[in-house]
């Protein structure tokens, strides 16, 4: 299907329901799907979503509450250090999760290909939280966050925004929740989001290696 045809179909797709189903997750298809605002949410079958409205966060609009400041430098930050351990932690800390073995294997492949990335938080060399997602152009497509210690996921988002501020990124948060709104995220229409992706996904990120953003 031509890109223009897919774009038109997505504009008229269900707002709060799967756009289509697939039997498997394939790394190459995931990369293409993300550039059209699609993401997988459940497995067997895989459900693909493109919600309207869409929740995004502009890094320089992050809200940092006063009570968070004491946590910001409490944890050690590592980038792309142990992606597999982080995504597994995201699965294991949820009683019900769409992150199954196939999902982990596929996203780890995307990590080895340089598309998927992780920001990990450590305390005394123990992984206690973080966030992972895909970077395509100047968009960080957030997939999941995890927090074992107090406010670890919030610190991860604050640190991610701090790192991406100089590069004119947007962060795709997928679906609105109060936790994200509290941090400065907001909803935009699907049409506006897809137009942003047309521009941002075709730009250079501005850095060579994500992991080198922390020196």
Swiss-Prot record:
Reported EC number(s) for this entry are 2.3.2.6
Q: Does the keyword Amino-acid biosynthesis apply?
A: no
Q: Which reactions fall under this protein's catalytic activity?
A: N-terminal L-lysyl-[protein] + L-leucyl-tRNA(Leu) = N-terminal L-leucyl-L-lysyl-[protein] + tRNA(Leu) + H(+); N-terminal L-arginyl-[protein] + L-leucyl-tRNA(Leu) = N-terminal L-leucyl-L-arginyl-[protein] + tRNA(Leu) + H(+); L-phenylalanyl-tRNA(Phe) + an N-terminal L-alpha-aminoacyl-[protein] = an N-terminal L-phenylalanyl-L-alpha-aminoacyl-[protein] + tRNA(Phe)
Which UniProt keywords are given for this protein, alphabetically ordered?
Acyltransferase, Cytoplasm, Transferase
GO BP annotations of the record are: protein catabolic process
Q: What class of enzyme is it?
A: transferase
Q: Which GO terms describe its cellular component?
A: cytoplasm
Keyword presence, Disulfide bond: no
Q: Name one GO molecular function term.
A: leucyl-tRNA--protein transferase activity
Q: Which Gene3D superfamilies match?
A: Leucyl/phenylalanyl-tRNA-protein transferase, C-terminal domain, Leucyl/phenylalanyl-tRNA-protein transferase, N-terminal domain
Where does the record say this protein resides?
Cytoplasm
- InterPro entries annotated for this entry? Acyl_CoA_acyltransferase, Leu/Phe-tRNA_Trfase, Leu/Phe-tRNA_Trfase_C, Leu/Phe-tRNA_Trfase_N
User: What is this protein for, i.e. what is its function?
Assistant: Functions in the N-end rule pathway of protein degradation where it conjugates Leu, Phe and, less efficiently, Met from aminoacyl-tRNAs to the N-termini of proteins containing an N-terminal arginine or lysine.
Under the heading PANTHER family, the entry gives: LEUCYL/PHENYLALANYL-TRNA--PROTEIN TRANSFERASE, LEUCYL_PHENYLALANYL-TRNA--PROTEIN TRANSFERASE
* Family as reported in the entry's similarity comment: Belongs to the L/F-transferase family.
Q: What is this protein called?
A: Leucyl/phenylalanyl-tRNA--protein transferase
Q: What is the lineage of its organism?
A: Bacteria, Pseudomonadati, Campylobacterota, Epsilonproteobacteria, Campylobacterales
């Amino acid at each position: 299907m031509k890109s223009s045809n897919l774009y038109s179909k997505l504009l008229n797709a269900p707002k709060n329901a799967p756009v289509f189903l697939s039997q498997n997750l394939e790394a190459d298809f995931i990369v293409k799907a993300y550039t059209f605002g699609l993401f997988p949410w459940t497995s067997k079958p895989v459900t693909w979503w493109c919600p309207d409205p869409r929740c995004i966060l502009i890094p320089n609009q992050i809200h940092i509450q006063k009570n968070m400041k004491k946590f910001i430098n409490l944890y050690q930050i590592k980038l792309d250090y142990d992606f597999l351990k982080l995504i597994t932690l995201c699965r294991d800390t949820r009683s019900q999760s769409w992150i199954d073995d196939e999902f982990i294997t596929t996203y780890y492949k995307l990590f080895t290909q340089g598309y998927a990335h992780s920001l990990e938080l450590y305390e005394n060399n123990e992984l206690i939280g973080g966030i992972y997602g895909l970077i395509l152009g100047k968009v960080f497509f957030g997939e999941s966050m995890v927090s074992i210690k107090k406010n670890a996921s919030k610190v991860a988002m604050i640190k991610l925004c701090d790192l991406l501020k100089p590069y004119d990124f947007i962060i795709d948060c997928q679906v609105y929740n109060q936790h994200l709104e509290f941090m400065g995220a907001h909803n935009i229409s699907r049409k506006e989001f897809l137009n942003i992706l047309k521009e941002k996904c075709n730009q250079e990120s501005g850095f060579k290696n994500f992991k080198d953003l922390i020196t």
